[in-house]
């Protein structure tokens, strides 16, 4: 199996403060090992190390209409939740296109997602259909595999996310975990 550390995605909201990105991605890799991921059975890699992620993202962004992006429900909600940041960038708006590239690059036929990610997968399917219509059948149209687990709640009651700064790192002290 493969596990991608999506470090390019972090640039969509942390583009101004990138000094911690390198250490964050290394910490995440160590956390994966500490949580029991066996590197002999699972290949994990950094998204930014595979240049084709960025290349396919660029190609897909050329054929994805802006209204498709602005109608993604998560977009408006995320802007409201992160209103203290300037998210008036293509990087943030185009986050779902980068996600589509992550899926389509590997020609995934099924994708495990939570309910909150269904709109992104629907957009991925639209982008794949448009690409296939323009250039021939290149990408399969991926189907979702819905996870049975509910959203993991962060320290502030919202969905746990590094973007919201509400995570409990695996290497936290017992006092921090208890809080």
State where each predicted segment sits.
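N-terminal Rossmann-like or analogous alpha/beta NTP/dinucleotide-binding catalytic cores
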Residues: 1-101
């Amino acid at each position: 199996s493969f596990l991608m550390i999506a470090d390019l995605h972090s640039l969509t909201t942390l583009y101004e403060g990138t000094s911690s990105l390198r250490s964050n991605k290394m910490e995440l890799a160590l956390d994966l090992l500490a949580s029991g991921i066996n590197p002999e059975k699972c290949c994990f890699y950094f998204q930014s190390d595979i240049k084709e992620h960025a290349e396919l993202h660029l190609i897909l962004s050329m054929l994805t209409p802006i209204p498709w992006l602005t109608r993604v429900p998560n977009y408006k909600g995320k802007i409201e939740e992160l209103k203290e940041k300037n998210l008036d960038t293509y990087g943030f708006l185009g986050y779902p296109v980068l996600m589509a590239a992550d899926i389509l690059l590997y020609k995934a036929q099924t994708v495990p997602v939570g309910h909150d990610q269904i709109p992104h997968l629907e957009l991925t399917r639209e982008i794949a259909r448009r690409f296939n219509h323009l250039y021939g059948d290149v990408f399969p149209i991926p189907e979702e595999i819905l996870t049975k687990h509910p959203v993991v709640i962060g320290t502030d009651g919202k969905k746990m996310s590094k973007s919201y700064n509400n995570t409990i790192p695996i290497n936290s002290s017992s006092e921090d975990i208890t809080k």
